[in-house]
Amino acid sequence: MKTSDFDYNLPQEYIAQKPAEPRDSSRLLVLNRQSGELKSCIFRDITGYFQPGDVLVMNNSRVLPARIKGIKQDTSAKIEILLLKSDGNGCWEALLKPGKRTKPGTIIDIRKQDGQIHIQAEVLADKEDGIKLLRFSDETLLMKLGEVPLPPYIHTPVSDPERYQTVYALTNGSVAAPTAGLHFTPELLERLGDMGVICTYVTLHIGLDTFRPVKEEDPSDHIIHREYGILSAETAAAICQAKANGKRVFCVGTSATRLVEQASSLSQNGIIELYSGWADLFILPGYKFKVADCFITNFHLPRSTPLMLTAAFAGWPLLQKAYEKAINEHYRFYSFGDAMLVL
């Protein structure tokens, strides 16, 4: 298995620049792993694939206003900060743009446009993959100074930043949205609940790996970034009950899937339990899924870890056929694009 196996060509015009309106009007490509059938429909019709007692697991992490603009104190040059992860003590891992010439000791002034809020960031150290360690003079003001970061391939401003949040987003912590969940509306979730589907939530704060291509020739050499996650006792109980009753677990997105699989792999008896901690499970083809029975996801970037997880779940040959069909039928790709359901 090589990283180049997960490459494909996508015309730029297929990259969705705006979200579907309404959310559940996006297209849905359904992959049946047993029959190999590929079927197109509208996302709101996904209800037809659920049965009473099935469990739907969603990631309720909320995207931080992690994009912050500042000015380097020594040169007055503009600089952009993308917050990645806090250490809980006022320091953050971050990406700087431009960043190569920004050395430890650099002071960055950050002001709100009205000038009423002013803090400073000091670059403390260089880390791997171009990441910098920053210390802020007042960490409590960061959320008032930033804006929600959009992926680098989206060039059209979004009029409503909430369109890059799921309708059930709750806990701040991600630098990218769990995009498979962007298709759900409150009404669609209510319909699923009325059908007897158990809607549950986990929290996994999404980091850099969502956009970062795997550069190693052998994907198993890639070190995935750790992301903090919480799986509650209530969600664990719902999953266990579904399994005991012969019902299915539908995971929404690669983040929810990784967290439930990590929690299962760390339990002594293989039964999913309450989990709180770092998630660093890198799922590649050949992995045996223990929790997820069905999988809802978007169309992912070439050579990315989410694409590799999807290939592990669907099977790469079938997934390649699905991507070919999606391109031929002008599906919309990436964060604001259409969705897939893998059964």
Curated annotation (Swiss-Prot):
Pathway: tRNA modification; tRNA-queuosine biosynthesis. The keyword S-adenosyl-L-methionine applies. GO terms for molecular function: S-adenosylmethionine:tRNA ribosyltransferase-isomerase activity. It is found in: Cytoplasm. Its EC number is 2.4.99.17. It catalyses: 7-aminomethyl-7-carbaguanosine(34) in tRNA + S-adenosyl-L-methionine = epoxyqueuosine(34) in tRNA + adenine + L-methionine + 2 H(+). InterPro entries: QueA, QueA_dom1, QueA_dom2, QueA_sf. Pfam families: Queuosine_synth. GO terms for biological process: queuosine biosynthetic process; tRNA wobble guanine modification. Keywords: Cytoplasm, Queuosine biosynthesis, S-adenosyl-L-methionine, Transferase. GO terms for cellular component: cytoplasm. The keyword S-adenosyl-L-methionine applies. NCBIfam families: PRK00147.1 (NF001140), queA (TIGR00113). Transfers and isomerizes the ribose moiety from AdoMet to the 7-aminomethyl group of 7-deazaguanine (preQ1-tRNA) to give epoxyqueuosine (oQ-tRNA). Belongs to the QueA family. Monomer. This is S-adenosylmethionine:tRNA ribosyltransferase-isomerase. It comes from Dehalococcoides mccartyi (strain ATCC BAA-2266 / KCTC 15142 / 195) (Dehalococcoides ethenogenes (strain 195)).
